Amino acid sequence: YNFDKKMINLLSSINKRAIYKNYPRRNYIDTNPIDDYAKKFENVKVIDGNYDFRYVNTLGDLFIISNVGQASTITWMINLGKPIIYLYTNKSDFLNTQAIDLVKKFFIFIDTDHYGWESDLKNILNKPYSELKKMWKDKQLYIDKYEEEWLTGKNLHAGKLGAKYIKELILQNTKK
């Protein structure tokens, strides 16, 4: 709740309109209080309800995510070709070092455990959209390089990737 509230305050202070869509949760019987809070700001539009991202993805020009665990949402976003800002924290994401390095290459990366991250994010969001697109285009080299293996591979799925990883690990550890 506090992180979402901080994000909404930050979004309300940038020089652009913002759309806020939280990840659907069933924590509340009534309206999610963070949605009600966000509606108080003139430049923040709240998407109510549990709409799947693919049905509302055309509304944004840039996306901010705080979890790479929603794989389908991530792949939808990447395929849109619009800038993605990833808010990383070691408090809830369980990414190994290799995954963190890849995420830094794929996305505009903000470490929310770092003092002053809010200012860093605000500075990025206040850039002209053409600069944001350039930042994103610079990431495309890495996305293209790793897309099939790590992101949106059309012939892969988690079971095959997991089996491939385990097989390689066993082979590496049994060679003498």
Question: Residue locations for each model-derived region?
Answer:
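Acidic donor-binding loop of glycosyltransferase active sites
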Residues: 58-69
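C-terminal alpha-helical cap of glycosyltransferases
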Residues: 151-176
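Short acidic alpha-helix that forms the nucleotide-activated donor recognition element
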Residues: 50-60
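Short, well-ordered alpha-helix to beta-strand connector turns
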Residues: 15, 59-61, 81
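Hydrophobic beta-strand scaffold residues
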Residues: 18, 46, 84-85
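Nucleotide-activated donor-binding/catalytic signature segment of Leloir-type glycosyltransferases, i.e.
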Residues: 31-50
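Conserved catalytic-core segment of nucleotide-activated headgroup transferases in glycan assembly
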Residues: 1-36, 151
